[in-house]
Regions:
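Non-catalytic interaction-recognition regions
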Residues: 1-309
Length: 309
């Protein structure tokens, strides 16, 4: 669309007509959504992630007209060059904050519009104390506009907290956004598959196990590699996803931690076989600085877990 203005115009028109409920467009859109959501749920299930609600922009499409009319009637929104906007600049601003566009000149809604309508919907249904948005850190200006507009137009209560948590991007070894070997955008399903394949290769290479058993183990260890590799980096910073490093059984990796847990369980298992029980165990004083350091680190575990939560 950057090079073909006619195509861009047709796309904008189609978007507007879809938002207005054109039947053929809506039917096609619903089919695409059903296929996409089913695939998303499958991928999230593979990551042991569940959501209580599955909602999209279209769920608030019907309340946008009511919201826009209220903003106009209460004097918050006005037309400028055909677009409906709300000024959100503040005296304390050190840089220019553009106005919040509610409706484009052709009447079409934007991400800003649906985000505001979603806030309105959540306030009416759930009355939350706080709403936390997690998105690419490059969306910071967008959410600054949305939050300011929501407060100015009284979509939220004065004491309702609106928070944005920006995260960095997962990049390849070249420092650019992570892609497939053929240069395409890396899909989550493909990423999970690649990691599982790499873990399977390493497990079969280093241990004599049956393929079926190795496949099951690869999925468990692969999940730890992906999750730990992502969470071990500061959320707001970009990082390089190196599949060789993340799937390694050495160093600060998910597979290494699982390997360590297995070793600990093995030691405890042998201890139990010899008649020992942890319940009757006695805490011994450390006999070296390394033991003391380990015990202090272990004692801090509960506090670290509470802080992370």
């Amino acid at each position: 669309s950057k090079e073909d203005e006619e195509y861009k115009e047709r796309a904008l028109t189609a978007t507007f007509e879809l938002q207005q409920g054109r039947r053929g467009y809506r039917a096609l859109w619903k089919h695409i959504m059903n296929v996409s959501v089913a695939d998303l749920k499958k991928n999230y299930t593979n990551l042991n992630v569940e959501f209580d609600l599955w909602k999209g922009e279209s769920d608030v499409q019907d309340i946008i007209p009511k919201m826009a009319d209220a903003m106009k009637e209460e004097g918050y929104a006005y037309y400028d060059q055909g677009a409906l906007i709300v000024d959100i600049k503040e005296e304390s601003d050190t840089k220019e904050i553009p106005p919040c566009i509610i409706l484009k000149s052709d009447g079409a809604a934007l991400y800003t519009t649906t985000d505001l309508a979603t806030i309105m919907d959540r306030m009416e249904k759930y009355h939350p104390d706080e709403m936390i948005y997690l998105a690419d850190k490059r969306q910071e200006l967008h959410f600054t506009q949305v939050f300011r507009c929501a407060r100015k137009t009284k979509l939220v209560n004065e004491d309702t907290r609106l928070s944005f948590i920006g995260f960095g991007t997962m990049n390849g070894k070249d420092g650019k956004p992570f892609k497939t070997r053929d240069g395409g955008v890396m899909r989550l399903e493909r990423l999970i598959s690649d990691i599982n394949e790499e873990m399977f290769r390493k497990i079969v290479e280093n241990r004599s196990v049956k393929d079926k058993e190795a496949e099951g183990t690869a999925k468990i260890v692969g999940l730890s590699a992906l999750k730990y590799g992502d969470l071990s980096n500061q959320a707001s910073k970009d990082y390089v996803f190196d599949i060789d490093r993340f799937t390694s059984f050495e160093g600060n990796t998910g597979p290494y931690i699982l390997y360590t847990i297995v070793r600990i369980k093995s030691i405890l298992g042998r201890y139990a076989q010899e008649g020992g029980t942890l319940e009757k165990g006695v805490m011994l004083a450390p006999v070296s600085e390394s033991e003391k350091s380990l015990m202090l680190s272990t004692a801090a575990f509960n506090g670290m877990m509470e802080g992370a939560f």
